[in-house]
Amino acid sequence: MDLVDPSQSAAAAAGTQTVKDEVSEKCQKLFQDFLEEFRGSDGELKYQSDAEELIRPERNTLLVSFIDLEQFNQQLATTIQEEFYRVYPYLCRAVKAFARDHGNVPQNKEFYVAFQDLPTRHKIRELTTPRIGSLLRISGQVVRTHPVHPELVSGTFLCLDCQTLVRDVEQQFKYTQPSICRNPVCANRRRFMLDTNKSRFVDFQKVRIQETQAELPRGSIPRSVEVILRAEAVESCQAGDRCDFTGSLIVVPDISQLATPGVRAETSARVGGTEGYQAEGVQGLRALGVRDLSYKLVFLACYVCPTNPRFGGKDLHEEDMTAESIKNQMSVKEWEKVFEMSQDKNLYHNLCTSLFPTVHGNDEVKRGILLMLFGGVPKTTMEGTSLRGDINVCIVGDPSTAKSQFLKHVEEFSPRAVYTSGKASSAAGLTAAVVKDEESHEFVIEAGALMLADNGVCCIDEFDKMDTKDQVAIHEAMEQQTISITKAGVKATLNARTSILAAANPVGGRYDRAKSLKQNINLSAPIMSRFDLFFILVDECNEVTDYAIARRIVDLHSRIEESIDRVYTLDEVRRYLLFARQFKPKISKESEDFIVEQYKRLRQRDGTGVTKSAWRITVRQLESMIRLSEGMARMHCSDEVQPKHVKEAFRLLNKSIIRVETPDVNLDQEDEHEAEEEPQEVINGDASVPSGVNGHVNGMNGHAEEPNAATPKPSLRLNFAEYKRISNLLVLQLRKMEDEDETSQRKSELINWYLKEIESEIDSEEELVTRKQIIDKVVHRLVHYDQILIELTQTGLKGTGDEEVPKEEDPYLVVNPNYILED
């Protein structure tokens, strides 16, 4: 071999003896026999075709299955596993000899071997010194990647004294010169020059991986380790990927520690004191090796593969995917299952139940999240403007309505998902941070949650608890799907093509149906408009629903396996999802007209003010409808968006808007509360009758003073839009009177003014009585429930209580100074 001979001849010339590693050489011979002789299940020589591939200039690594090696020779497999770092160079020589036998490869080309299918997987925190040098498989999430650069692995040095070439000086992960010139008559130990043309370099990349949450012991913080990738393994993983790394644990000098300024620790045998022998020995042991013994553990990986591969084989980049390439990656059985799923008439429902088997109800939310996973089609206009295809979903709801469960399910299911909490996330943690590299001392970009979830889903819990300045940081990522950074001398625009699934709690803990959506959640208008779907989950008391949910929870606790009913397994859903996402459905003319028609309906209804409790309908909602329609078409593996897909998209969008519409206002609600709190007054027949209109109410409902007659009395309800209209009229009138006359109006005066305003609408005396009753109760609600109006009573001494009673029945009314009139 040209690798060994020069050093051996030089060693022989120098009069030194080279020690042969018999175990490694035997492994080399047996491993070459394995490559030559091993046959696959089809009877063909398995690795011969792979060796022929190595002729290509970009290929230099032969991938070997460890299971095949165990079948061929168990003892060889055990030796390689235990002594991997020792025998690795000899295995590479065996691959080189094998490649030369089966192909016309260049003489000076280096080859490497990589192992896959190792039976056991180790955790990062199990990487301790006893495992150094053995073949291991570890898994973790990539959190930082460094750029690829050339690494000197074997140097050729020129002696500056005698011009002798010293070849194949192995570099121990730092610049290493020969210890002495190999010319026997030259004693040079320092003056060497590297000959870069005759030295060997290899691609080198450093990545940092971190423990995943599933592997984390209780009460521990995630450990991280640096992984060194070489040759073909470089650029095989990106920040955010969860990967398996096969290789060995090694010890390398800590360059950053060696580079720190400090005095080199030296040992000396000094003689001092009254008696010389007392002070003999090494002095300064405390400082010994402070610089020299700075080493750290790193993982040298020869093979990288995704932890949860989309199929049994290689992972595919989303840009390179076609139906044919995906089909080729699947087995016949897997492809038949995908085809069977695409023909399923009830696919929509079955996918929802398979994804969220432990969550009862909330079918609309499940459908929205399912369409988010399929996504729309990203587009680029002629001007170069990008239109996002990812769908953003926000779930707003009361506590204990399974919001976080949805987020956790998506994080576990999606191959590329990041889960984070809003309160514990900063702007840099969500987007990207600029940090200083320990070794090069240059500024590098460290990926945040949105970058880690590129081409995936970012789940943000407690979205409403985020600080405003941190919410602003994700404006750009949610619409333009990029992150722009200009700090610390680094200017970059990064991709964040991610769907955002957010969960938020309403203000005050409970969703108030009497208020609009934007009043219920602590989010700015720009953020709200960037969400395609809003789902409101209200914890309502319903005997049937409560029983079903309780039964489901108890079933899950008692019979976990039996109660989870999945139509498809998660792997089947993942496979189908990836296959369906490569479709790029186009909108047909019929669907286009239908989308425009539905958008007009939404806009007109928004203009009438009926849905003031929903957010504003803008062009973004039109784009949302298009994305949802494309997601529906993708789910059914259709190349064209059909009207039925638009119909379902409109229904979902409409549902998320209508869902927040307020029910009719119960004007008798306060009377019912009073009846519960003051049972004595109900018996007397006074509590259920509002003050000021006793005569009319008694005239309308018969004998209201009888307790039995009051019980079946139907509650008086008013449409919410009508209620808001009346309240706005009253507020405007009171403010007008305050501005003009600087005086307040009494309650009776305000009621009379309102009745006079609607005089043309009243046809009979009965209707007048009803309208008076309604306006009286509206004023009562505005004062005591909504606190929009304030009653001003005449102040006086406690002893004059009898004189104040008639004035309190007709108090002055003013508008609460903190109240802002809605448009």
Curated annotation (Swiss-Prot):
Q: What is the designated name of this protein?
A: Zygotic DNA replication licensing factor mcm6
Q: Where is it localised? A: Nucleus
By sequence similarity, the record places it as follows: Belongs to the MCM family.
GO terms in the biological process aspect are: DNA replication initiation; regulation of DNA-templated DNA replication initiation
Top-level taxonomic group = Eukaryota
Q: Which reaction does it catalyse?
A: ATP + H2O = ADP + phosphate + H(+)
Q: Where is the composition biased (Acidic residues)?
A: 667-680
State the Gene Ontology terms under molecular function.
ATP binding; ATP hydrolysis activity; DNA binding; DNA helicase activity; zinc ion binding
UniProt-annotated binding residues for ATP: G397, D398, P399, S400, T401, A402, K403, S404
Region entry Disordered: which residue ranges? Answer: 666-713
Tell me its EC number(s), please.
3.6.4.12
Task: Point out which parts of the chain are C4-type zinc fingers, as ranges.
Answer: 159-186
Report keywords, A-Z: ATP-binding, Cell cycle, DNA replication, DNA-binding, Helicase, Hydrolase, Metal-binding, Nucleotide-binding, Nucleus, Zinc, Zinc-finger
Report the function annotation for this chain.
Answer: Acts as a component of the mcm2-7 complex (mcm complex) which is the putative replicative helicase essential for 'once per cell cycle' DNA replication initiation and elongation in eukaryotic cells. The active ATPase sites in the mcm2-7 ring are formed through the interaction surfaces of two neighboring subunits such that a critical structure of a conserved arginine finger motif is provided in trans relative to the ATP-binding site of the Walker A box of the adjacent subunit. The six ATPase active sites, however, are likely to contribute differentially to the complex helicase activity.
Q: What SMART domains is this protein classified in? A: MCM
Supply the InterPro entries for this chain: MCM, MCM6, Mcm6_C, MCM_CS, MCM_dom, MCM_lid, MCM_N, MCM_OB
Describe the subunit structure.
Answer: Component of the mcm2-7 complex (RLF-M). The complex forms a toroidal hexameric ring with the proposed subunit order mcm2-mcm6-mcm4-mcm7-mcm3-mcm5. Begins to associate with zmcm3, mcm4 and mcm7 into mcm complexes at the neurula stage.
